[in-house]
Amino acid sequence: EDRPKFCYLPDDPGVCKAHIPRFYYNPASNKCKEFIYGGCGGNANNFETRAECRHTCVASRKGGPRRP
């Protein structure tokens, strides 16, 4: 696999209480999905935009990461 290992981490809102829409990669569906981030903590599977998430983690059918 060409995608970074952190793409396989679960969505993690972190320990703070903000309400920030973010995106994470879901390996089961090979798609980037929205979740609510608390603003601190969490993990690296956390992207500001769906495009950034796709560029980093979503594999194309040809086997490499898909370009945005």
Curated annotation (Swiss-Prot):
Tissues expressing the protein: Expressed by the venom gland.
Disulfide bond sites: C7-C57, C16-C40, C32-C53
Stretches assigned to the BPTI/Kunitz inhibitor domain: 7-57
Chain coiled-coil ranges: none
Residues with site note (Reactive bond for trypsin): K17, A18
Compartments reported by the entry: Secreted
Any Pfam family the entry gives: Kunitz_BPTI
Database matches in SUPFAM superfamilies: BPTI-like
PROSITE patterns: BPTI_KUNITZ_1 (PS00280), BPTI_KUNITZ_2 (PS50279)
Keywords: Disulfide bond, Ion channel impairing toxin, Potassium channel impairing toxin, Protease inhibitor, Pyrrolidone carboxylic acid, Secreted, Serine protease inhibitor, Toxin, Voltage-gated potassium channel impairing toxin
UniProt-annotated site: May be the major determinant of the binding affinity for potassium channels, residues: K5
UniProt GO MF annotations: potassium channel regulator activity; serine-type endopeptidase inhibitor activity; toxin activity
In-chain residues carrying the UniProt-annotated modification Pyrrolidone carboxylic acid (Glu): E1
GO cellular component: extracellular space
Family that this chain belongs to: Belongs to the venom Kunitz-type family.
Role according to the record: Serine protease inhibitor that weakly inhibits trypsin (Ki=0.2 uM). May have potassium channel blocking activities.
Protein name (record): Kunitz-type serine protease inhibitor PPTI
Organism of origin: Pseudocerastes persicus (Persian horned viper)
Top-level taxonomy: Eukaryota, Metazoa, Chordata, Craniata, Vertebrata
